[in-house]
Regions:
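Gly/Pro-rich turn-and-neighbor structural signature
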Residues: 1-106, 208-209
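Structured mid-domain segments that build the active-site/substrate or prosthetic-cofactor binding neighborhood
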Residues: 86-92, 99-209
Length: 209
């Protein structure tokens, strides 16, 4: 998947605080048009055959939506086949979801989720602090609203996050088994995961604790 667009230094606005909304949108359009042209020249002339994604982080959302005076990127034809990857609020809660009108857009939808976060107003790192039941609730809601093309999760340092990462990937891979139609299965999943990883060291009674 080729990521499209451009972010500013240290995840800031591209042109800085002094630039207008229109200036930032026009600049992004120039960047994306150039990227698409390079993809045509170097990868495939048919852009529909090249998976592309635009991540809509919080500093990019204003450019995506625009305002009453400036058209945003969301209806720009150059992005028709590009997957729009939405982001939650950095703490595992959905912020925005596709509307009924644009749920079936050609490029589809993705979600960027967090198990680890470094930034304002507070960081949480190096420890598994996300309940699987919350992951189930939030990502099932995302799936039901049409976010089914790309799921990405920020795990930070991998070592403390093996369980939630495994759950996130299994939920995406086998949604019929673990998704919306299977509520209250996170305990069952945890037990299966423990058996897979450490089964030889625990008897059944200990696994149920």
């Amino acid at each position: 998947i080729i990521t499209m667009g451009m972010r500013g230094e240290r995840d800031s606005e591209i042109l800085g605080h002094s630039a207008t909304l229109k200036e930032n949108i026009d600049y992004l359009k120039e960047v994306i048009t150039t990227q698409n042209q390079l993809i045509k020249e170097c990868v495939n002339e048919d852009l529909d055959q090249v998976p592309r994604m635009l991540a809509l982080y919080k500093e990019v959302e204003a450019y995506f939506h625009g305002d009453e005076n400036t058209q945003g990127l969301k209806d720009w034809k150059e992005l028709d086949g590009v997957t729009f990857m939405l982001c939650e609020d950095n703490f595992g809660n959905m912020r925005t979801l596709p509307t009924k009108e644009n749920r079936d857009r050609k490029g589809g939808w993705g979600m960027y989720y967090h198990f680890d976060y470094h930034g304002d107003p507070v960081s949480y790192e190096w420890v598994n602090s996300t309940h699987l039941s919350k992951v189930w609730e939030q990502m099932c809601e995302a799936y039901d609203y049409g976010i089914r093309d790309i799921w990405v999760v920020n795990v930070g340092d991998l070592k403390p996050q093996e369980l939630p990462l495994s759950y996130f990937l299994d939920l995406a891979y086998d949604f019929d088994k673990w998704g919306t139609l299977s509520p209250n299965k996170t305990g069952e999943y945890t037990k299966e995961w423990i058996c897979t990883q450490f089964g030889a060291f625990f008897n059944e009674e200990e696994q149920d604790r």
